Amino acid sequence: MSQIHKHPIPAAIAERCLITPEQYDAKYQQSVHDPDAFWGEQGKILDWITPYQTVKNTSFAPGNVSIKWYEDGTLNLAANCLDRHLSERGDQTAIIWEGDDATQSKHISYRELHRDVCRFANTLTSLGIKKGDVVAIYMPMVPEAAVAMLACARIGAVHSVIFGGFSPEAVAGRIIDSSARLVITADEGVRAGRAIPLKKNVDDALKNPGVTSVEHVVVFKRTGGNIEWHEGRDLWWSELVKKASAHHQPVEMNAEDPLFILYTSGSTGKPKGVLHTTGGYLVYAATTFLYAFDYHPGDIYWCTADVGWVTGHSYLLYGPLACGATTLMFEGVPNWPSANRMAQVVDKHKVNILYTAPTAIRALMAEGDKAIDGTDRSSLRILGSVGEPINPEAWEWYWKKIGNEKCPVIDTWWQTETGGFMITPLPGATELKAGSATRPFFGVQPALVDNEGNPQQGATEGNLVITDSWPGQARTLFGDHERFEQTYFSTFKNMYFSGDGARRDEDGYYWITGRVDDVLNVSGHRLGTAEIESALVSHPKIAEAAVVGIPHSIKGQAIYAYVTLNHGEEPSAELYSEVRNWVRKEIGPLATPDVLHWTDSLPKTRSGKIMRRILRKIAAGDTSNLGDTSTLADPGVVEKLLEEKQSIAMPS
């Protein structure tokens, strides 16, 4: 595999890069052999109120998982992203906002963003929100979403951003779990010309009898669409900030004070509230942003991720703003109203660094040269990829067509739980191979282990684990440290288990092969099969369901659901639509099954365990080697499923 074509470091990048190959080797060695010295130095990327003396205090030991970085230091995240830049670059653009409608865009300077954040911080305080309170944010991709997040950080409130594509039920579940006191939303969102009923979804979520903590809903007017109004509970954003002062003293936070909760899908049941704290997280977001994108002052940077995902937190907002960068926030989608929209935005705003997802790249690739019609993209210097492994064909297309064969593709592997990049090329230090995330970032110690946890040496394949902590690591799951230990540290002792498989080639480059647990990656978004199965089984006509992922040319994985109906119920076209809409309503559009496979029974072991391995193979049409079926209670089930599969229309 190491013989695959390598893309050399372009001369234009090598001339002015922040990290050379020699520097990478030296810094990496220092970072793993003396993390205190290395991260002690890197911590200076931020301004501290009380400087830290202790750098690393971490343990992955069973029953004693504890992660603390810079624990005696104090700082404020918003002050690091805004206040400290005012004297030197107050008039520089902090956020470029590009609307869904291309005629709408605006530039917000660091001074203006600081003013807006101070006003909203005072607004939050006037509503009784204080340090440690949880604020739920369910917003479209508008600058006010960033203002809300930064204002929470400024006063020490913990934000829980909920992706605008989630259903009222999913919103309610996240509010209940976090006991959020306030919800910040908009009347509607806008995406690909369609209105998204955000306020209505919040209203529906708050009707859930389990929601008892919410006192107010702050509503930003995005479209002016008709909405229900609950007097006393609902408050207009514009009216609140009008009354608020533009002066606000940021609250001094300990490095280990909670910053945000972000819910992510797990392999079992309900979503997990991943908790990140202030100091280590921001050091890590800023250093990874700086080095992985080879950021130079004046660069225009565009990360296409929604603020509702961790990529939006770390690499649309906090990493870039901590470094004083200009970050572009895009309300729309890359191929609307035409296939070349993404390329048009690059040209319009002279974007130098573009960070997007393989799903978007594959969708554009399917359009061929229409994706770049009438554009030259000559401003681009660095390309990035995030969300799932990128297949070599899509990588090469992205490099060739979008980047004009001159921009390194920074293929980043990381997770909600890692806070920032774990395995990634550095533009001036890494020769690239299409489809490989290449080598670990500073301080990251990956290993590949077999199913018993034995480390595998050299070129090999295995479960991807990390053997020591890094500053951006999640500290716990909100309100459930036991589940945190169980999920990430119990499979392999004294190691963080990512849930991903990977292989390492002869050059030490890592290739991520995908999830090894029951988690799907659909369009770069994680969905737990258990979550989708629970939604299916809650339908009154469904007895049992098993969900697997199948390869999909655009989305990476599509959702294939095996469904057993209750006795006396018959499959029909109406029920097919009803069940798909049911899941959409329970979780959100992302989780809608692409295929429903009606069946009378599922392959189970004698102990009643569903054999998902077999279901995955049948769904993918890979029937050459179904493996050992002798443990099945009824081996005949497999034949029947294969027969039924013949008549099922598959998504392209």
From Swiss-Prot:
Enzyme class, UniProt record, top EC level: ligase
Domain of life: Bacteria
GO cellular component, one term: cytosol
InterPro entries on file: Ac_CoA_lig, ACAS_N, AMP-bd_C, AMP-bd_C_sf, AMP-binding_CS, AMP-dep_synth/lig_dom, ANL_N_sf
Residues bound to ATP: 387-389, 411-416, 500, 515, 526
EC number: 6.2.1.1
Cofactors that this protein relies on: Mg(2+)
Keywords: Acetylation, ATP-binding, Ligase, Magnesium, Metal-binding, Nucleotide-binding
Binding of Mg(2+), residues: 537, 539, 542
Modified residues (N6-acetyllysine): 609
Residue ranges crossing the lipid bilayer per the database entry: none
Amino acids binding CoA: 191-194, 311, 335, 523, 584
Catalytic activity as recorded in UniProt: acetate + ATP + CoA = acetyl-CoA + AMP + diphosphate
GO biological process: acetyl-CoA biosynthetic process from acetate; chemotaxis
Family affiliation: Belongs to the ATP-dependent AMP-binding enzyme family.
Protein name in UniProt: Acetyl-coenzyme A synthetase
Source organism per UniProt: Cronobacter sakazakii (strain ATCC BAA-894)
